[in-house]
Each structure stands twice: as C-alpha cells, then as structure tokens.
Amino acid sequence: MLHSYSEYVDEGMSMKKDSKTAEAFANSWNNLPLGSVYSDKQVQDWLLPLKEKDFKNKRILELGCGNGSFLLHIINWEPLYLEGVDLGDSVISAKKNLEITQKNWDIIQADLTEYKGTNFDIVYCIGVLHHLKDPKKGFDAVIKNVKKNGIFHCWVYGKEGNALIIYFVDPLRKICCMLPWWYTKYCIATPLAILFLIYANLVAKFSFIKLTKLFPLYEYCLWISQREFSFFVHVSFDQLVTPQTNYIPKSTIQSWLRSCEYLEDWYIIQRNGNSWKFGGALRNDTIYRLQLLIR
C-alpha cells in the first residue's frame, strides 16, 4: 500500500504568487484538531451531482486539499487511489489525517496551477480557485489532470448573491489578512461568527415569512443554520485570513467551460444562492455521461 508525503522539487516554491494565500490557509488548517471539519453529508452536498458510487475503484485527485478534510471522507468511498495536492504546509496535517487508513493515498506539496499527475478518473477542486491570483489557470490545471473519459468538479464563491460579503466583509479581509492568524481567529472571526450565528438562526426561524427571502444570504443562512458554532468560526476565519478572494460570476464559468476543447458535457449549479458548483465529462460514452442539470 502507498502511504506517503511528497514534494515537487521547486527552488522557487516560496516565491509562488499564491504562496501567501497557501501560508495563510496552512495556519488555519494546522491549528485545528485532527480529523475532518466537514460531515459526510456536507462533502456529498459539495460534490453533487457526483455520488459516492462514482468514486469507487477510481483514481481520484483533489487539487487544494488543505488538511485532508475531504480526503478523509472520500477514502472511505473505496477509490482505487487517492491523491491530494496543496501548495501550503497544510499537507503536514493532511498526511497525519490520512495516516489512520491503510488504503492507497499520497499527499503532494506543489503548486496546483503547475501540477500534472497521470490518469485521474476524477479531479475535483473545492473552494480553492477563487483564492488564486489567476483562477482560470487553476481551472486549466483541473482539466489537464483529467484523463480521457474522466470527470472534473469544482466549487467557487459566486459574485451573484454575495453583495453583503463583497462590500462589507471583503474590505475587512484586506486588513485581517495582514494580522497574526490567532488574532484574526479569536478576536475578529469568532465575535463575527457569533453575530452571524444569531442572524442565520433568526432567518431560518422566520423563513416561513415571505419577506425573509429578501434578506441577504437567505439560502445560505438556511444551510449554515444547521451547523454547529465551530463551523461558523471556521467559515468566518476562512473569509478573513486569506490575502486573495475572487467572487466569480456565472458568465466567467461559462466562458471557461466553453473554452474547453475536449469537454463533452458540462453543468453549472448554484449552491445556497451564493456559490457555483460546476464540472463536466471529458468523454463520449453515454453510459457514463453526466446528467446535464443546468446550462
């Protein structure tokens, strides 16, 4: 069985244009307890329309794996081989998390925008492209790692539905990303998480009133109100710790997909009213072709 932690030899690793973002998220991931911050239900939701059965006996690649929170769930879906790539030192936590299993996996420290593996049936990238200096380059990396007849799936923050975040939270992020991670997490993100917890739960409680549907982040509030407080803190900290965040409109995603020469089928699905899931199949086989949901 393969269990390892590898590093692409690259003398310029610390000079990569996304290295500051990778370092910020490594500070976030490496200061969490071992284990996944997500439930299996959350992981399944992020990956839909892909399902657990799609991963069985397949070679899987995650670009931007963080501490391995997604990998910890997918390893139980019986993939043939599972690989995670991340630029930051969060790969240390990912390796520790994956060491509990005796299955085939590898964790690689590398710039995902330049990484090229081999023969992956499914490549996914969750919550990473929007933090890159060049999100399109990240998308291109996803595509180039999918083998012929393979599948890819991504999730990004949307420009649509995020006005509150873009105009009020993002300016705060530009300040917080320069502060020590512990100060941002405990002195800023945690108090904001308390306020958002109250807001989200009030929106959910009174969702039977039609007027609440006009409130900012309505659909997102219905989703996150079901989560524990620690997840609110995790989300708030993630929003504030990074030096780079892009909010990507649907039209941009459409242009990415249409520029993909070998793409047979593709889909774009709005998630919780403020983000986009999208992906497709680089193949011709109608038996395994993805169902087109939204185009």
Predicted features by range, described:
Residues 1-61, 65-118, 122, 246, ...:
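Conserved N-terminal segment of class I S-adenosyl-L-methionine
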Residues 90, 135-139, 156-158, 165:
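Catalytic cores of eukaryotic secretory-pathway lumenal/extracellular enzymes that build
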Residues 114, 130, 159:
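Active-site micro-motifs of SAM-dependent methyltransferase domains
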Residues 122-133:
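A short SAM/SAH-binding and catalytic strip from SAM-dependent methyltransferases
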Residues 136-148:
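A short glycine-rich, Lys/Arg-flanked "PGG" loop and its adjoining helix->strand segment in the class I
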Residues 151-190:
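Conserved class I S-adenosyl-L-methionine
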Residues 180-258:
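Substrate-binding/catalytic lobe of Class I Rossmann-like enzymes that use SAM or dcSAM, i.e.
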Residues 254-268:
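A SAM-dependent methyltransferase catalytic signature shared across enzymes that methylate proteins
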